[in-house]
Amino acid sequence: MNSIKQILLISTSIILSSIALIYYVYLLIVPTLPPLDNLADYRPKEPLQVFTKEGDLIAEFGEEHRDFIKIGNVPQKMINAIIATEDRRFFEHYGIDLIGIFRATYKTLLGISFEGASTITMQVARNFYLTSDKTLKRKISEILLSLEIEKHLSKEEILELYMNQIYLGQRSFGFNSAANTYFSKNLSELNTAEMALLAGLPKAPSRFNPFNNYDLAIKRQKDVLASMLRHGFIDESTYILALDQPINLKESKVKKDVDAEFIAEMVRKDLFDEFGEKIYSSGLKVFTTIKNKNQKLANQAVRDGIINYINRHQPREPDGFLDLENIALKHIDGNEEELIKEVTKYLKKFPTFSDFIPGIITKMQPLEIEVILKDGRIINVYKKGLKLIENDKNYEDQTEDYRRIKVGGIYHFIKNRNEWILTQLPEVESALIAMDPNTGEINALVGGFNFEKNKFNHITQAYRQPGSIFKPFIYSAAIEKGVTPATLVNDNFFFMTADELMTKENWEPKNYNDTYDGPTRLRVGLSKSKNMVAIRTLKYIDPKYAQDYVSRFGFDKQKIPPYLSLALGVAEVRPINLISAFAVFANGGYLKEPYYIDKIIDSNDRQIKLKSSITNEDTPRIIDPRNAFIMDSMLKDVIKDGTAKRARILKRTDIAGKTGTTNDLIDAWFVGYNPEHIALTWFGYDTPQSLGDQETGSRAALPIWIDYMKGALDGLPEKIYAEPEGIIPHKINPDDGTLTSNDDESGIYEYFYEEFYPKDNAFFMIN
């Protein structure tokens, strides 16, 4: 009787519990289940990607690294590894594993944490809609959602969602992204052992992270391989081979094809200003105007220019010092590995920027030094890479204590064209921008030595004094007012009293090197960058007129004071404005605003535009084409026989440009172009200080431009600047600028506006 009562009691309890569970499920849980729209139209969180014009990756912005892959492109062996490990009956069940679910539910009711009974479908449900809380409600919701997912999606579609959505550590979502993160490979490039390691990550990505817990990760990988063997996904020979296959870990955050971090940050900021935080997850692809070849040339040229500058000057004290004798005594047994380990541990606190690697000098000989690098490599630097030692004025001292380059000192080392070079982490900065003068399309931009070291963009953010590079705009204003390239200007001492200037001090500017040539043609004054010629020309045309005139080139009028010192570039300009201003001379008179975004593609492959998009179509002409032509011819002479004659090494007749140096050698500039390409280089310190003796624009900035242009113009035919209407070419006497017969062999051709052509050959000089 008691047995019957017990059976009835248990049966009643089960029935009532079932009714309660059904009520709980259908009245309290089912109404709260989310719709499956996200799965039917799957849009994974994808980072913002920035590309070159050719489509090579520059940068990626977003918290989740994801590289979406279609299920048809996933290697079958990768699928097999996942099925064997996560859900071996995946292709047989309808979303749930009943035996596993009953076991998990029973343990949950008893308050015992359950072990994994989740199918792949259930993991998809959880990853898209639910938390990982181990509660009954969440588990029931997961089951119901899994059943719904199986009703609406095929097994292949479910597997594709899983392959791309699952978190696998190191901010990587999806197996294709994880392959790149852990191995720097695509999924299709992995061997069986590497696939098995990835397949073991979903269970506990942090615990089985091979970077942090290598031994645990390998143990888990072996479990995956054993499961694949046990369930017939691989045979015995493949299993044994996989156990011996190498696991070549190689961390890769993002595979960048081109180093252009400054332009990437400019793009990111523009998009963030317009679209906000969603840019980091909406899968936008931005194709810039940056060209692979040009950007790589620019990076190399700036780097070489900085290294050459460092090697021209007295080295600083080492970044640090390690007493190698004491370390050697600790390892008197001759254990070199332990010594290297201790040295590299010390070197870890010194930063690596670009490919400037910290290292310690361990041995010094007259023509060779031995170095241990931060990564443990032992290298030798030979004579070609030891120019810094030649500039160490204390090197010949008898005691090593006074030397700045010495054993135990911490310096930086860089491999340049297969030669190691001893150098130091630069304190100086340099920048380069290059663009098409006819469109404004930026093809290369280097905002500074290294973006990680200093994110300040010297091309777009820095206001610097242009110095003598500003003179062409003064001469352009003068030509528009009737002065000609043949006009004589007195290159002699200039003095103005404080009363004349209405200031507290007299003003007595000087030419560079303090040399003066007397009456000098305007053209020669520009090519030799004569300060007195520029000052007297500005005084003749009036500084206020010049201020109004040059503002049409895009300069901020408030930063261009209408004083005579403007002739020496005492103003403030941004390099990006300066290059677009010079492009006016290159393109026949048009002001083209520099731009760097070619197109933006959204996740639906539709092209979108920023409100701030720049279009240079129908750009108005800001100066007379004759003015641009004459200025171009004068700027060609700067290279032909002036301060930039070093650029003749390029052996081109279609290039023009101007050097620039500010007072006390604080800023060095060069800008140069041909009709199809223009580039500007700047060199200086963030906190203004002298670059050092003779560090003019022609020495510090021009070589960078030459190195860049050598490659940028390689293979491009020379282009002739067409002479516009309204120009009269006529020979002049080079000594006094007066007209002479066109048959006069001693005469040289000069260009004149037809309305300013000196018909009466009147002699005229600006004093």
Show where each model-derived region lies.
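N-terminal type II signal-anchor transmembrane helix
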Residues: M1-F51, R89, L109
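Short, well-structured active-site flanking segments
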Residues: F91-I101, F173-N176, D235-I240, I479-D499, ...
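Mid-domain, small-residue-enriched loop/turn segments at the edges of structured enzyme/sensor domains
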Residues: T503-P509, D542-S580, Y596
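Non-catalytic, structured segments within soluble enzyme domains
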Residues: I22-Y23, L27, G111-L373, T537, ...
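A penicillin-recognizing enzyme superfamily signal
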Residues: T288, N292-Q295, N299-A301, E336-D355, ...
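Active-site SXXK
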Residues: I82, M228, A298, P366, ...
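Conserved catalytic neighborhood of penicillin-recognizing serine enzymes
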Residues: K107-K134, S188, K255-D259, N438, ...
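Short active-site loop at a secondary-structure junction
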Residues: D67-G72, D392-Y402, L425-S430, K453-F473, ...
